[in-house]
Amino acid sequence: AAILQDEYLXSGGVVPYVFG
């Protein structure tokens, strides 16, 4: 579950980073 899809996609990681 991606908290912030922008950070999730932007970071290109598997884990959704809230703090980027």
UniProtKB/Swiss-Prot annotation:
Residues 1-20 form the Peptidase M12A domain. It catalyses: Cleavage of the triple helix of collagen at about three-quarters of the length of the molecule from the N-terminus, at 775-Gly-|-Ile-776 in the alpha1(I) chain. Cleaves synthetic substrates and alpha-macroglobulins at bonds where P1' is a hydrophobic residue. One of its GO terms (biological process) is collagen catabolic process. This enzyme is a metal protease capable of degrading the native triple helix of collagen. InterPro entries: Peptidase_M12A. It comes from Chionoecetes opilio. This is Collagenolytic protease 23 kDa. Its EC number is 3.4.24.7. Transmembrane segments: none annotated.
